[in-house]
Amino acid sequence: MSEKKSSSGEKLLYCSFCGKSQHEVKKLIAGPSVFICDECIDLCNDIIRDEASSVETVAGPRTDLPTPQELCELLDQYVIGQNPAKRILSVAVYNHYKRLKHLGKKDDVELAKSNILLVGPTGSGKTLLAQTLARTLDVPFVIADATTLTEAGYVGEDVENIIQKLLQNCNYEVERAQKGIVYIDEIDKISRKSDNPSITRDVSGEGVQQALLKLIEGTMASVPPQGGRKHPNQDFVQIDTTNIMFICGGAFDGLAKIISERSEKSGIGFSASVKSREERTASQVMMDTEPEDLIKFGLIPELVGRLPVVATLRELDEEALIQILLEPKNALIKQYSKLLQMEGAELEIRPAALQAIAKKAIARKTGARGLRSILEHALLDVMFELPNEQNVAKVVIDEGTINHGAKPLLIYHEQAKVSGAK
């Protein structure tokens, strides 16, 4: 029985499992002719948790988490070159999600989160690396532009808007959002203007770094429900950012000079490197990036400390850009070939044209990002006229089309048949 009368005649309720009265426990929950206390509920939760962790141990350390080598191979399918950065990213992301899998386990060692800083020129693949990782792991992903952020209370985007976008990208599933990836681009553009802490208000520089710091190290972010604006007397969705992986990226123009100056100071005397400054490219110099260089550049020490994994990406050369045009799963040439195929035509880009495209992108200093605009410009007239043409078999792009704006060569079906017969 779960009900008894006390000596004073008062009706007492007892837990059906441990037998404690309603006065001995904090809470007694009633069911059909049974009662259970809060202490027994906690005990049941512990038993279920222990059973779940033992099942996980039997099944092995991971179920569907790719190893660093597998992650690196997946990145190879979409991103050309940048092998050192791929290895660093693969290990960091693997360790991060391995850490999340073991969060519920009781252990003396608490695994800290390692966020990532990607340093590399425009168009070197920073954003693509982060996007590919998120897609591979099937986790919510958002790209934020650091230049649009301001401190709370000023005109511009609040840093918590980043978490709001992440939540929107996973249909407001809080649990999924708390294990997502946030990529913050142009992080170098919010550097403070001098080495010394600012005495005036810097709402889009050091102030934003301070606001981002709380988000990156882990805080409870208050997000308006369903994308509304913040206003008083409103219920907020609480998101814990502790387990969100933050990847920050930037070109860091001028960082190579800071590194060179540090290297020259430390390399005086017989131990000095005889390699002249001209012999090393900016990309090679930036491979030696140290935390002190980033602080001198304008990132606050606390933020540098929260981004312990630094991966440097090299500037892409002509050979790498040609590979990007041809080799990845979603290579640009494959994309434009597919577009022309829908109109019944084949696309042929001659080797000299590929070299011309790569050289033009290098001259513009836009890296891989500039390849699409060059190809788009070369094929614009063809894509405009082709839907009205009935008989085009092949579109040929040569060096003259890229360098001098000459019209692409159109080969018609009759010509193709004649050349085939010969």
Swiss-Prot record:
<dbReference type="GO" id="GO:0051603">
    <property type="term" value="P:proteolysis involved in protein catabolic process"/>
</dbReference>
<dbReference type="Pfam" id="PF06689">
    <property type="entry name" value="zf-C4_ClpX"/>
</dbReference>
<dbReference type="GO" id="GO:0140662">
    <property type="term" value="F:ATP-dependent protein folding chaperone"/>
</dbReference>
<dbReference type="InterPro" id="IPR027417">
    <property type="entry name" value="P-loop_NTPase"/>
</dbReference>
<feature type="binding site">
    <location>
        <position position="37"/>
    </location>
    <ligand>
        <name>Zn(2+)</name>
    </ligand>
</feature>
<keyword id="KW-0479">Metal-binding</keyword>
<dbReference type="GO" id="GO:0016887">
    <property type="term" value="F:ATP hydrolysis activity"/>
</dbReference>
<keyword id="KW-0067">ATP-binding</keyword>
<keyword id="KW-0143">Chaperone</keyword>
<feature type="domain" description="ClpX-type ZB">
    <location>
        <begin position="2"/>
        <end position="56"/>
    </location>
</feature>
<keyword id="KW-0862">Zinc</keyword>
<protein>
    <recommendedName>
        <fullName>ATP-dependent Clp protease ATP-binding subunit ClpX</fullName>
    </recommendedName>
</protein>
<dbReference type="GO" id="GO:0009376">
    <property type="term" value="C:HslUV protease complex"/>
</dbReference>
<comment type="function">
    <text>ATP-dependent specificity component of the Clp protease. It directs the protease to specific substrates. Can perform chaperone functions in the absence of ClpP.</text>
</comment>
<feature type="binding site">
    <location>
        <position position="18"/>
    </location>
    <ligand>
        <name>Zn(2+)</name>
    </ligand>
</feature>
<dbReference type="Pfam" id="PF10431">
    <property type="entry name" value="ClpB_D2-small"/>
</dbReference>
<dbReference type="InterPro" id="IPR050052">
    <property type="entry name" value="ATP-dep_Clp_protease_ClpX"/>
</dbReference>
<dbReference type="InterPro" id="IPR019489">
    <property type="entry name" value="Clp_ATPase_C"/>
</dbReference>
<dbReference type="InterPro" id="IPR003593">
    <property type="entry name" value="AAA+_ATPase"/>
</dbReference>
<dbReference type="GO" id="GO:0051301">
    <property type="term" value="P:cell division"/>
</dbReference>
<dbReference type="InterPro" id="IPR010603">
    <property type="entry name" value="Znf_CppX_C4"/>
</dbReference>
<dbReference type="InterPro" id="IPR003959">
    <property type="entry name" value="ATPase_AAA_core"/>
</dbReference>
<feature type="binding site">
    <location>
        <position position="15"/>
    </location>
    <ligand>
        <name>Zn(2+)</name>
    </ligand>
</feature>
<feature type="binding site">
    <location>
        <begin position="121"/>
        <end position="128"/>
    </location>
    <ligand>
        <name>ATP</name>
    </ligand>
</feature>
<comment type="similarity">
    <text>Belongs to the ClpX chaperone family.</text>
</comment>
<dbReference type="InterPro" id="IPR038366">
    <property type="entry name" value="Znf_CppX_C4_sf"/>
</dbReference>
<dbReference type="GO" id="GO:0005524">
    <property type="term" value="F:ATP binding"/>
</dbReference>
<dbReference type="GO" id="GO:0046983">
    <property type="term" value="F:protein dimerization activity"/>
</dbReference>
<dbReference type="GO" id="GO:0051082">
    <property type="term" value="F:unfolded protein binding"/>
</dbReference>
<dbReference type="GO" id="GO:0008270">
    <property type="term" value="F:zinc ion binding"/>
</dbReference>
<dbReference type="InterPro" id="IPR046425">
    <property type="entry name" value="ClpX_bact"/>
</dbReference>
<keyword id="KW-0547">Nucleotide-binding</keyword>
<feature type="binding site">
    <location>
        <position position="40"/>
    </location>
    <ligand>
        <name>Zn(2+)</name>
    </ligand>
</feature>
<comment type="subunit">
    <text>Component of the ClpX-ClpP complex. Forms a hexameric ring that, in the presence of ATP, binds to fourteen ClpP subunits assembled into a disk-like structure with a central cavity, resembling the structure of eukaryotic proteasomes.</text>
</comment>
<dbReference type="InterPro" id="IPR004487">
    <property type="entry name" value="Clp_protease_ATP-bd_su_ClpX"/>
</dbReference>
<dbReference type="Pfam" id="PF07724">
    <property type="entry name" value="AAA_2"/>
</dbReference>
